[in-house]
Amino acid sequence: MRFEKWQALGNDYVIVERDALPFELTPERVRALCAPHSGIGADGVLELAHVDEPGFVASLRVFNPDGSEAELSGNGAREAILYLRRAGWTDQEQFSIRTAAGELRPTILSDTTCRVDMGRARDEGTGEICGFAYQQVNVGNPQCSIRVTSEADLAALSLAELGPPIETDVRFPNRTNVSFWTELAPNRIRARIFERGVGETASSGTGACGAAVAHALRGGDSPVTVVLDGGELEVEVGDDLHIDLTGWAEPVYAGELSPELLSRLASLS
């Protein structure tokens, strides 16, 4: 079984084509693929499939390393989009892909960069959690965005301690992603991301979008540069909360699963 591993700002995914899979991707199999020592090792798996729908090049499913399926990944979407171009699924600069969160409309800017029309975010209100004021938004997946006062305060946070109780709070029945952010300038913010089913990550495209929307709702500029541990993303938030995400992604390597690993995966339910 052939696969490619891609990364975007340190957020790495295994990309597989459904037609090449000898079995269905189940939570156990996803966990085995993402295992760092006995599998490929990744932050998740992206499954691409052909669709018979005018204007659509593919459908995309996103799996977290714990085996759960996510509605969307901003970094994963860019990786999948650029993979589709490189693999010859399309030669168009603009096309659509289907996700659990709805239609994504990318524009290819270069071999390694694209802009993705992520659709409209939803303002889902504010509250207080773990001693922090938060803004809840949905950008295709749930995002709990928390503003802190300074870079020093942001750096001092232990996301390993704060992330799990926020992610699993009863107010978020499907669990939530969490972004902590601070304003560096009206058009520049710094963020740290705790992803649902993953933990703290070097970057997250949808996490960056969640922080950017929260920043915009507080009167911040758009577009805004979101500075993450893994690099920078540009997010444009319209007055109607319509989001465009721009950033890069690149292939790391391609390979074939060994017969031994394939046999082990096939034995899992």
Describe the function of each predicted region.
Residues 1-110, 145-269:
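A glycine-rich beta-to-alpha transition motif near the start of alpha/beta enzyme domains, typified by
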Residues 118-134, 159-161:
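Active-site glycine-rich loop that binds ribose-phosphate moieties when present
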Residues 120-122, 139-143, 249:
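Glycine-rich beta-alpha junction loops
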